Amino acid sequence: MSTVRVDVGGAMRITVIGKGNVGGGLARRWQTAGHDVTALGREGGDAAGADVVLVALPSAVIAEGLARVSGLRGQVTIDATNIFGPYPAGFESLAQQVKSIIGGPTAKAFNTNFAALYDQVDAEVVRPGTLFASDPEARDITEQLIRDAGFDPIYLGDLGQARLLESLIGLTIGVAKGGLGPFFYRFNRPGELSAR
């Protein structure tokens, strides 16, 4: 259970675990939005002051990477990892593995977006989307941080849907390699695609 109360809509203290394209890119976007962001790399560090934790590690080193971080105490957590290889024993999704280690309300988000495009989000006429799944207690915070990164949140369901999101990596890469290249996406209701 989370020991942290976060003021949704206000500045949050965010610890990003992983300084690669995803973690580093989101850290920059959230800093620009006014959040207090600390980025931790392979050396680990302390997350005790964080309201929210983002996990952006390679799937094979999630447990090892999180073991190097002290102060993980049930914070709201966003898991942005993707599966490459087999799932860890005992877990149906990487998000469940992350939740078992950190212990707080968890969401799966940002794993279906191309980090290479983060710096182009603001140039878009319409906000691109981000699919996410979330524990109820993490939903409002996750939606706010998705918006603060420049995307529109698209809710898929509770954290039980995380594996479905993780399975999209093959489709996402396939579409990109098929000729489209890195892309934004958006889902709309009927009538919303008409010219504005």
Which residues does each PLM region occupy?
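NAD(P)+-binding Rossmann beta1-loop-alpha1 motif at the extreme N-terminus of oxidoreductases
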Residues: 2-45
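Hydrophobic Val/Ile/Leu positions in short beta-strands of Rossmann-like dinucleotide-binding domains
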Residues: 14-16, 55, 132
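Hydrophobic residues within alpha-helices
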Residues: 26-27, 98, 142
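General beta-strand structural signal in soluble alpha/beta enzymes
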Residues: 39-40, 105-111, 154-158
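Rossmann-like NAD(P)-binding element
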Residues: 44-76, 80-85
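Rossmann-fold NAD(P)-binding glycine/threonine-rich loop
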Residues: 81-122
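Short beta-strand and adjoining strand-loop segment in the mid-core
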Residues: 85-87, 120-138
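Active-site-lining helix/loop region of Rossmann-like oxidoreductase modules
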Residues: 129-196
